[in-house]
Every structure is written in C-alpha cells, then in structure tokens.
C-alpha cells in the first residue's frame, strides 16, 4: 500500500517528465549520435527514440492523449539509466544532462513503488529496444545510415512540434496516479493482444 504522499510525489514527477519529454528526446538523440558512447548504449537510445515517436493509435480519447505519453516518458529515462554503464564517457554524458539524470535512480524507485508490475513491463522493454524495427528498418540502420538517421531526426522534430502536452494541459488532465496506471494497463493489454494476433497469424 502506497502512501498518499508518495502518490502525489509520483503524479508531480510524471507531470514534470511529460512536460519535458520533447527536451528529453533531444538528449536521447545526443546519446544516439555520441560516438564516444559504447555502441549498445547508442542502439538503446535510437530504439527509445523510435518507440517515443511511433504513433500509438490505441488511445483515441483526447482526454487520455496527454497521459498516453506517460510510458514513453518513463521508458526514455529508464532506458538511458539502464543503458549507461560506469565508463568514463558514460559518466561524462550523464554529467552533461543533470536535469535528466540527477536523482533519477530514486525517482525510478518511486515509480516502481506506485506502478508495480507495470514498471517491470517497461523494464523488460529496454532490452528489446535495439531490436525493434521502425518504418521497416532495423534500429542499427538508423545509426549507420545517414539518410535513415535524417528521417528519424525529422520524425523527432515533427513529434516535438505536434506534442500536445504543456504545463496547463497536464495540470488539468493529471491529478491521480491511477490516471497514469490505467492508461498504461490498457497499453499493455493492447500490446499483449497484438502479440497474440501475430502469433496466431
């Protein structure tokens, strides 16, 4: 059972992450393009960019549209946190972006305490990020092919331009932790259903 204080802190946190998602996406692009970072880190960064900018059609209700980015916002931070190891270059990358990495471990622990197995579901996605396909191309292609990278970058710009979340919309729409977890549960169920359909095909 989580305390009211933890729950309101979680809501506050996710609100902030939702507002900063376009900025955080730029940090993921920086990680993807940073040749000093180990290749696996860059692949995770590219994968999480593709995950975030892919349209998620399952949320048709405008009211939920804002909150439907919550899994993207949490996954982006989770992926970068998990991918970046203790190496010197990785450490200096973290230091360049304190707004994303400072206190992140504690914040993710807070998310886990509220989200429970939904957090486990997101954690399990991190390992699959480098293997996803985006617009018919493998993620590695976006690292190795200039034209593909340009396309991903353009899609990132479009995403940031069209992103419907700001301080005002988020304060109106997001007041309770269950608002976030309910939408994530639907996303998880939708994904499981899609996998089931694929498996039967």
Task: Give the location of each predicted region.
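Long alpha-helical, hydrophobic tracts
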Residues: 1, 17, 29, 38-43
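Polybasic, low-complexity association/targeting segments
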Residues: 1-23
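Alpha-helical phosphate/pyrophosphate-handling elements in metalloenzyme active cores
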Residues: 25-35
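Transmembrane alpha-helical segments and their cytosolic interface motifs
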Residues: 33-53
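Membrane-inserting effector segments that mediate pore formation, membrane fusion
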Residues: 47-76
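Membrane-interface alpha-helices
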Residues: 65-96
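Intrinsically disordered, low-complexity, charge-dense segments enriched in Lys/Arg
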Residues: 101-201
């Amino acid at each position: 059972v989580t305390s009211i204080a933890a729950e309101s802190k979680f809501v506050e946190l996710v609100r902030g992450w939702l507002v900063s998602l376009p900025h955080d996406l730029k940090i993921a692009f920086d990680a993807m393009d940073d040749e000093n970072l180990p290749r696996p880190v860059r692949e995770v960064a590219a994968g999480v960019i593709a995950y975030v900018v892919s349209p998620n059609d399952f949320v048709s209700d405008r009211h939920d549209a804002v909150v439907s980015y919550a899994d993207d916002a949490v996954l982006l931070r989770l992926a970068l946190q998990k991918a970046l190891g203790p190496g010197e270059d990785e450490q200096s990358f973290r230091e360049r972006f304190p707004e994303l990495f400072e206190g992140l471990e504690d914040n993710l622990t807070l998310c886990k305490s509220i989200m429970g197995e939904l957090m486990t579901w997101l954690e399990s996605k991190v390992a699959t990020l480098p293997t996803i396909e985006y617009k018919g191309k493998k993620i590695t292609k976006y690292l190795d092919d200039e034209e593909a990278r340009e396309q991903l970058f353009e899609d990132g710009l479009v995403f940031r331009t069209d992103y419907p979340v700001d301080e005002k919309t988020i304060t109106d729409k997001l007041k309770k932790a269950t608002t976030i977890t309910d939408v994530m549960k639907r996303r998880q169920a939708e994904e499981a259903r899609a996998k089931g359909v694929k498996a039967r095909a």
